[in-house]
Amino acid sequence: MESTLGSDLARLVRVWRALIDHRLKPLALTQTHWVTLHSINRLPPEQSQIQLAKAIGIEQPSLVRTLDQLEEKGLITRHTCANDRRAKRIKLTEAADPIIREVDSVISSTRGEILSGITTDEVQLLVGLIGKLEQNITELQNKQ
């Protein structure tokens, strides 16, 4: 019987994000919005749109639409990079601070609940295995 590991991992990510999405409904953010805000907050300050798109794993045109919406909400600003006028740097605004705190809190508490009953060693083993899978995939992509 063929392994369904890839499908299982994809489903896990989908339901995990859906649970967080449900818990963040009061903030009136779409999943794309909170994932983007969370990623901006985790990356070094003033990332370029290209770097952010790579970190999130989406295409830059999709990210631009999301950033436009977040800028309209007053949660981010974008400015032209001094070294490359084509590049835009992204910065969270002060208005984003309480939202980021709530998003981080919900993500952290949800992670804790999801991982309840799983030991630290088991989590570390899983993280290591996922890292190996990702490395294998990257190597396969680089061969093409």
Swiss-Prot record:
Organism taxonomic ancestry: Bacteria, Pseudomonadati, Pseudomonadota, Gammaproteobacteria, Enterobacterales
Residue ranges of every copy of the HTH marR-type domain listed in the record: 2-135
Stored SMART domains: HTH_MARR (SM00347)
Name under which the protein is recorded: Transcriptional regulator SlyA
Family note: Belongs to the SlyA family.
Function description: Transcription regulator that can specifically activate or repress expression of target genes.
GO terms classed as biological process: response to stress
DNA-binding positions: 49-72
Pfam families: MarR
UniProt keyword annotation of DNA-binding present: yes
Keywords annotated in UniProt: Activator, DNA-binding, Repressor, Transcription, Transcription regulation
SUPFAM superfamilies given in the database record: Winged helix' DNA-binding domain
Assembly and binders: Homodimer.
Alphabetized InterPro entries for the sequence: HTH_MarR-typ, MarR/SlyA-like, Tscrpt_reg_MarR-type_CS, Tscrpt_reg_SlyA, WH-like_DNA-bd_sf, WH_DNA-bd_sf
Molecular function in Gene Ontology: DNA binding; DNA-binding transcription factor activity
Domain of life: Bacteria
